[in-house]
């Protein structure tokens, strides 16, 4: 994803766990209300549990590790990372978030081979929809089950992976060309 660089002292782990304003608000209330008998704390704790907040940190650490972060990196200020590592931290946040729609812009840039393999597996088993822009054909082949092509103000849907899309598109274009040639022959025949 093309995200802005982190500022302040937000750690890599905090960046990866900043998944929802509701969760952040519930956590802030929990920290601000030390009294276990407080109704506000009880409500915040219930909301935190509903949002799966108790497993969030463990999940984020697992995802960060999959993206090749070392445990020592988790508490490092995110602003000290290079652009490629910041991108990985944002990818971690997206995977931890588990949105219904995952939008990725050149997500394989800055990933080494091992990390790329892990990331492909995560995206391939993602339960929501994925909208991605990528020049990495191998990545597209491994994750795509359908392609939407936007061309000439039209949207066409193709089922299958990227190679299947290329084959289907070539077949469609060949059919259109054959139909056009037949039409031109008919026109020429009627003009004679």
Q: Can you say where each PLM-predicted feature lies in the sequence?
A:
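ABC ATP-binding cassette signature C-motif
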Residues: 1-182
């Amino acid at each position: 994803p093309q995200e802005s660089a982190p500022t302040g002292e937000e750690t890599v782990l905090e960046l990866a766990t900043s998944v929802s304003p509701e969760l952040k608000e519930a956590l802030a209330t929990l920290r601000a209300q030390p009294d276990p008998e407080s109704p506000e704390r009880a409500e915040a704790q219930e909301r935190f549990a509903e949002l799966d907040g108790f497993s969030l940190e463990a999940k984020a650490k697992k995802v960060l590790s999959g993206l090749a972060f070392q445990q020592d990196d988790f508490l490092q200020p995110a602003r000290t990372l290079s652009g490629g590592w910041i991108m990985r931290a944002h990818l971690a946040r997206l995977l931890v978030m588990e949105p219904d729609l995952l939008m990725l812009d050149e997500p394989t840039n800055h990933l080494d081979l091992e990390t790329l393999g892990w990331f492909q597996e995560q995206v391939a088993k993602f339960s929501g929809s994925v909208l991605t822009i990528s020049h990495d054909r191998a990545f597209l082949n491994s994750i795509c089950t359908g392609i939407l092509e936007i061309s000439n103000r039209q949207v066409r849907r193709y089922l299958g992976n990227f190679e299947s899309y290329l084959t289907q598109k070539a077949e469609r274009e060949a059919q259109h060309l054959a139909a056009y040639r037949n039409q031109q022959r008919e026109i020429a025949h009627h003009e004679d």
